[in-house]
Regions:
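Juxta-kinase regulatory segment immediately upstream of eukaryotic protein kinase catalytic domains
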Residues: 1-22, 158-178
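ATP-binding glycine-rich loop module of kinase domains
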Residues: 2-57
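Short beta-strand
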Residues: 27, 70-74, 120-121
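Short hydrophobic-acidic sequence motifs that mark active-site Asp/Glu residues
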Residues: 34-36, 42-44, 68, 80, ...
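Conserved structural core of kinase catalytic domains
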Residues: 60-63, 67-103
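Conserved kinase catalytic-core helix
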Residues: 90-136, 152
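C-lobe/activation-segment region of protein kinase-like
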Residues: 119, 132-178
Length: 178
């Protein structure tokens, strides 16, 4: 566990407290810590309430989108959501190339961001998980309805670093012609 473990939850049920004691640590980032609960759901505990408000608000607004995990509970300081398994896009690209199916999913994801009315049409490669069936799930949405970023800058940067940006853009150009 990090030396910076500065989280606290108030007014949690005894069942949730027990579940947390039995949970497996999945990871810790700048904004929170995530555990896998025994019921195969994930709980994210946030450091700052402002980040919790933003992420829980986004996940509630996008609840019908297949690209985001289902949210089960959002109470001050934490979110219980669907566990997202799979391979992070950045790690996937280290092992292999971007294929047409994955290009299509990434393109559909960007179109979904626009459909959802996001002002921030951007996501980091490390926040995109490739599922066994090659669909995508996104974790850690941030500022999607607040900050204006009109193109997927972080995604493009990640694809460029792995020499895959041209392949993706060529696919998009080809599909847009149709």
């Amino acid at each position: 566990m990090s030396k910076n473990f500065d989280y606290s939850l108030k007014d949690i049920s005894s069942n949730l407290e027990k579940s947390l004691k039995e949970a497996e640590l999945l990871g810790e980032g700048h904004n929170g810590v995530v555990f896998l609960l025994k019921n195969n759901k994930a709980i994210k505990i946030f450091r700052r309430m402002s980040v919790w408000k933003d992420e829980s608000s986004i996940l509630k607004r996008v609840r019908k989108s297949r690209f985001f995990p289902r949210i089960y509970e959002a109470k001050p300081g934490y979110i219980i959501r669907e566990y997202v398994d799979g391979v992070r896009l950045d790690k996937y690209l280290r092992r292999g190339n971007l294929d047409e199916d994955l290009c299509k999913e990434l393109y559909l994801m960007i179109l979904e961001f626009e459909r959802l009315g996001f002002k921030r049409i951007d996501i980091r490669c490390k926040d995109i998980y490739i599922q066994d069936d090659y669909t995508l799930k996104i974790i850690d949405p941030k500022n999607n309805y607040k900050k204006r970023v009109s193109f997927p800058r972080h995604l493009f940067k990640g694809l460029f670093k792995r020499d895959e940006l041209n392949r993706f853009l060529n696919y998009v150009a080809e599909i847009d012609e149709k």
